[in-house]
Amino acid sequence: MKVTDVRLRKIQTDGRMKALVSITLDEAFVIHDLRVIEGNSGLFVAMPSKRTPDGEFRDIAHPINSDMRQEIQDAVMKVYDETDEVVPDKNATSEDSEEA
């Protein structure tokens, strides 16, 4: 399985989230709402998640092996590094990261 497309929108915010991302796998399956987060050790790609009733976050979709996780990380960060446009936080929603 290969990452065949990355749609990324950098956002301007005071928080740790730096971009919203959608990826396409094998030109056949899209995953929305990945995020680029600034962590203590640098930028990383966080999988889409939702908050449970007890306040914890659980991934909705995620790779099950380290090779796929690394491929997603590499593909997203390549596009992140190549993207100059940043939108204000008020415009950064999940809908903005969907394909037009």
Swiss-Prot record:
Q: Which UniProt keyword terms apply here?
A: Cell cycle, Cell division, Septation
Query: At the top level of its lineage, which domain of life is listed?
Result: Bacteria
List, alphabetically, the InterPro entries matched: SpoVG (IPR007170), SpoVG_sf (IPR036751)
Q: Which GO terms describe its biological process?
A: division septum assembly; sporulation resulting in formation of a cellular spore
Do you know which Pfam families this protein is assigned to? SpoVG
- In UniProt terms, what function does this protein have? Could be involved in septation.
Extra info from the record?
Expressed more highly under biofilm conditions after 24 hours of growth.
Q: Which family does it belong to?
A: Belongs to the SpoVG family.
Query: In its UniProt entry, what is this protein called?
Result: Putative septation protein SpoVG
Source species of the chain: Staphylococcus aureus (strain N315)
